């Protein structure tokens, strides 16, 4: 009996790698008519630094989630033409080899303008060392929006793919589509992310009723959600209702944010006819429940990226930021080590929820909420002015970045004395699926 229970426990609490969750929302489902594309990025490591980088070595410049200025792969990005791409890894397309999903995205950001350009790329890409098992999400400045399931066929050495148009009411009647890690064309009931898919479906359905969809709403309600649809349990709601009576620790089981989470990113596209350089990214690097959403644009180049999300120029020894790591990411991960503080045995399968959210209002999510609100409100007000002008003013962007930097660096929760439980935060994380 003990063996059976132990086996069940391992199955319940096992943490899967590459457990990404995503959505594409067309303009018909948002209040302002602009599309949104979101990905909660997970990988194989528990604690690794991520950053936003700028790349101008291809046909088109782009900014996004990649590890350096000359990356071979990208994991989420937007280019100067308003082409935006992300992916979630497929775990029921069986390839048997290391995946090259990010290589395709980097190539797409370099050369694509439209969704059709990306489809054409899949037809023509050279494949000597590329292996793909992925769901690519794409939006463009012309209103294109689709998921494309892609797998590599070793028998033909070509890519096989299926396009799911989010503008098609037969496929997405409410104007949005969700993907996790199982493919509609993969092996049935295999793969992962079914519970996260159901949780996201419930949350988005509730938001759709009043067209609540904004970048901030998505990060708050999805990337900081502790709702498990299979169990019918929402830990944040339980705390708010005074119903949570636990000791603080809960299983880190099938939530959208998890110990393997690297970042949460939303990109807001443009309406037809708008300047594609107004395409706006928002990223909560590290672990979204302990991070702050920071905006980014392609228009300002590398200097236009906020200092807290790009590679760190100055080693902030007072805050123990790793050399060339993104400041906000390492600050977030320092708090994350306090959430996942039990490292012996199966301890990493549990998180200290009371550190994140509690009845006293002192959880990390609660302390960072006013910081993020100030950043978000300030940015959206400036963005509206740029939309009226039809372009981003680089001097105003620099001033905005300075204000955001000051707000984030002044957050008291980031200035407490924390001890790393897992050693120094590293720079790994190339497999952000």
Question: Language-model features: where?
Answer:
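Proteins synthesized as precursors that undergo proteolytic processing into mature forms
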Residues: 92-136
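Sec-dependent N-terminal signal peptides
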Residues: 4-13
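Active-site nucleophilic cysteine motif
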Residues: 20-21, 131
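Alpha-helix boundary/capping residues
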Residues: 11, 122-126, 207, 225
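C-terminal, well-structured catalytic/ligand-binding subdomain of enzymes
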Residues: 21-22, 27-71, 77, 83, ...
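Sec/Tat signal peptide C-region and signal peptidase I cleavage site
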Residues: 13-19
């Amino acid at each position: 009996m003990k063996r059976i229970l132990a086996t069940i426990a391992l199955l319940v609490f096992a943490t899967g790698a590459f457990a990404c969750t995503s959505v594409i929302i067309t303009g018909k489902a948002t209040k302002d008519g602009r599309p949104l594309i979101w990905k909660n990025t997970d990988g194989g490591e528990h604690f690794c630094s991520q950053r936003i980088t700028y790349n101008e070595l291809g046909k088109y410049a782009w900014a996004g989630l990649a590890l350096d200025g000359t990356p071979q792969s990208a994991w989420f990005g937007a280019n100067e033409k308003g082409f935006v791409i992300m992916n979630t890894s497929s775990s029921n397309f069986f390839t048997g080899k290391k995946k090259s999903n990010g290589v395709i995205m980097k190539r797409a950001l370099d050369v694509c303008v439209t969704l059709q350009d990306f489809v054409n790329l899949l037809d023509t890409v050279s494949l000597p060392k590329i292996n793909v098992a992925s769901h690519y999400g794409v939006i463009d400045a012309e209103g294109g929006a689709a998921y494309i399931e892609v797998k590599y066929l070793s028998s033909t050495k070509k890519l096989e793919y299926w396009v799911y148009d989010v503008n098609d009411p037969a496929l997405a009647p409410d104007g949005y589509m969700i993907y996790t890690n199982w493919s509609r064309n993969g092996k049935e009931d295999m793969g992962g992310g079914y519970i996260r898919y159901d949780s996201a479906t419930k949350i988005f359905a509730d938001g759709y009723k009043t067209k609540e969809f904004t970048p901030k709403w998505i990060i708050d309600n999805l990337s900081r959600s502790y709702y498990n649809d299979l169990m019918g349990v929402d830990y944040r709601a339980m705390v708010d209702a005074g119903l949570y009576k636990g000791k603080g620790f809960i299983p880190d089981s099938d939530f959208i944010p998890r110990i393997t989470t690297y970042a949460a990113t939303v990109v807001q596209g443009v309406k037809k006819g708008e300047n594609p350089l107004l395409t706006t990214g928002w990223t909560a690097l590290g672990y979204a429940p302990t991070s702050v959403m920071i905006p980014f644009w392609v228009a300002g180049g590398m200097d236009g990226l906020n200092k807290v999300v790009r590679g760190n120029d100055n080693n902030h020894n007072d805050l123990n930021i790793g050399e060339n790591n993104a400041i906000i990411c390492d600050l977030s991960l320092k708090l994350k080590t306090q959430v996942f503080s039990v490292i012996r045995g199966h301890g990493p399968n549990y998180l200290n929820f009371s550190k994140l959210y509690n009845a006293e209002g002192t959880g990390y999510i609660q302390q960072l909420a006013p910081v993020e609100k100030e950043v978000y409100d300030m940015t959206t007000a400036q963005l509206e002015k740029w939309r009226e002008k039809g372009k981003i003013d680089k001097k105003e962007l620099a001033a905005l970045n300075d204000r955001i930097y000051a707000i984030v660096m002044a957050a008291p929760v980031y200035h407490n004395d924390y001890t790393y439980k897992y050693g120094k935060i590293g720079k790994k994380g190339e497999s952000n699926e």
